[in-house]
């Protein structure tokens, strides 16, 4: 098989196999080919991984942030040196075009290692608090063993986004990738060892829905970081709460992207397409509710159709391909069910909605799809589809669109396109979301915090802010004189 790893799991610095686990077949979405066969972690494998992480963490935490950061920066260098190899693996794992993975996936992971490796000495600090004769100080200390649970849309990126802040803060990690995309995280673990990371600090275990509870409920786990759906998030949160564990969650969204009539039309359409079709629409922060002011609705839709129909769909390994297949048959079928629901509820299909003609019949392809005349109560305007389906809604004025944009249980992201920056800042202040863009969309450099509100989760990935979620504050009071007691 073309992408078979040495073994299913990576624990304590080496590959580990246990064929007693449930079989996981890694399928290349473009052709339906089985490219690797792995095994889900048994309870014994989970125990082995957590034991390794627990054993290795104290010595790692005793190292200086500079020393820890140096190893992460070396891992970033190795990832960049092997960007082509890692990008091709990511394409096999996910079906995303190589045109995309080579600029957005391993490189983003490398950015994370480099960023956190660089800021650790300055960011992992505390405060000095004078108290007259006495004084106090605070320091940030690691939590211990952290569990990362990844999603299938950006497997390598997520493995790094969770691993980098955890490791540089002095923690160890056990990472479980999605069973749909099991391959990339194993390579990340290999590279970290090559970069000099001590054994046991970054472990990868494969698994399905039954594996998560084994990790989350383990008494030696101090922290859980999840990227996934809202239903999964609720289950993980409930389990983690029973053990009073630290939790951060980046969950789903149904984000609004608002286009006012003074916006640059081409830029707004470009932003809407990035926010709906990149990664074949499988991005949690996508702006899938595109609100267009009525004055420009027809011109917006006409040009949007032209540009959408020109998207190149095909073999993900062809660098000319702009849109690849869905990650799995199950996900494609789910998206098709939403398309049918949109039609039946009265939305107007502008373009797409079917299977492209020029692709493998065994691939999980779907055309980029645009619906117009969508109303707020329609299913496709309320539920996260997680596929290349854009819903265009129209609006009259600012107050109306802000109220409608906020009328959702989600709060991950939002975007505003307008030439009036005063209005832009006023609108984003009123939008209920954690990550917002003005006159662009879906740009997430590691320097800025990323995360949501409401049912879209809590906590933040990236930026120095992320380190707060992988450390806790220790306060030390220093008495400088005799102790006075009333007895």
From Swiss-Prot:
NAD(+) binds at residues 150-152, 176-179, 229-232, 252, 284, 384. The keyword Transcription does not apply. It holds the Pfam family Aldedh. It is an enzyme of class 1 (oxidoreductase). K(+) 2 binds at residues 244, 454, 457. It comes from the Bacteria. Involved in the biosynthesis of the osmoprotectant glycine betaine. Catalyzes the irreversible oxidation of betaine aldehyde to the corresponding acid. This is Betaine aldehyde dehydrogenase. It comes from Sinorhizobium medicae (strain WSM419).
């Amino acid at each position: 098989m073309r992408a078979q790893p040495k073994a299913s799991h990576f624990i304590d610095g080496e590959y580990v196999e246990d064929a007693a686990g449930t079989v996981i077949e890694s399928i290349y979405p473009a052709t339906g080919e089985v490219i690797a066969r792995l095994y889900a972690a048994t309870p014994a494998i989970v125990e082995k991984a957590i034991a390794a992480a627990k054993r290795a963490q104290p010595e790692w935490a005793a190292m200086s942030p500079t020393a820890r950061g140096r190893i992460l920066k070396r891992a970033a260098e190795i990832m960049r040196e092997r960007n082509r190899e890692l990008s091709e693996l990511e394409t096999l794992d996910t079906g995303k075009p190589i045109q995309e993975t080579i600029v957005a996936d391993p490189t983003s992971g490398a950015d994370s290692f480099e960023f956190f490796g660089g800021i650790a000495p300055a960011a992992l600090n505390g405060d000095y608090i004078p108290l007259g004769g006495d004084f106090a100080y605070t320091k940030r200390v690691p939590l211990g063993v952290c569990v990362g649970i990844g999603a299938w849309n950006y497997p390598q990126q997520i493995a790094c986004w969770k691993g980098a802040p955890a490791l540089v803060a002095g923690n160890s990690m056990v990472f479980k990738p999605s069973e749909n995309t099991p391959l990339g995280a194993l390579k990340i673990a290999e590279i970290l060892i090559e970069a000099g990371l001590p054994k046991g600090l970054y472990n990868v275990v494969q698994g399905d829905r039954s594996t998560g509870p084994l990790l989350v409920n383990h008494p030696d786990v101090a922290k859980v970081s999840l990227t996934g759906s809202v239903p999964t998030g609720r289950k993980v949160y409930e389990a983690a709460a029973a053990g009073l564990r630290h939790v951060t969650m980046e969950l789903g969204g149904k984000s609004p992207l608002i286009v006012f009539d003074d916006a640059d039309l081409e830029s707004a359409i470009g932003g809407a397409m990035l926010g709906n079709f990149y990664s074949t629409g499988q991005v949690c922060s996508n702006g899938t509710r595109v609100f267009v002011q009525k004055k420009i609705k027809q011109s917006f839709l006409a040009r949007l159709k032209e540009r959408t129909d020109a998207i190149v769909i095909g073999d993900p390994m062809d660098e000319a391909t702009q849109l690849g297949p869905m990650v799995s048959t199950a996900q494609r079928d789910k998206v098709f069910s939403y398309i049918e629901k949109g039609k039946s509820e009265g939305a107007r299909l502008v373009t797409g909605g079917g299977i492209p003609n020029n692709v493998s019949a065994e691939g999980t392809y779907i055309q980029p799809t645009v619906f117009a005349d969508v109303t707020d109560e329609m299913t496709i305007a309320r539920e996260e589809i997680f596929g290349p389906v854009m819903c265009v809604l129209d609006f009259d004025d600012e107050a109306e669109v802000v109220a409608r944009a906020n009328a959702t249980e989600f709060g991950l992201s939002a975007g505003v396109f307008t030439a009036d920056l005063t209005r832009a800042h006023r609108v984003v202040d009123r939008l209920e979301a954690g990550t917002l863009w003005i006159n662009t969309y879906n740009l997430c450099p590691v320097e800025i915090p990323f995360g949501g509100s409401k049912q879209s989760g809590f906590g933040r990935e990236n930026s120095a802010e992320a380190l707060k979620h992988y450390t806790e504050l220790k306060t030390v009071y220093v008495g400088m004189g005799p102790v006075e007691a009333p007895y």
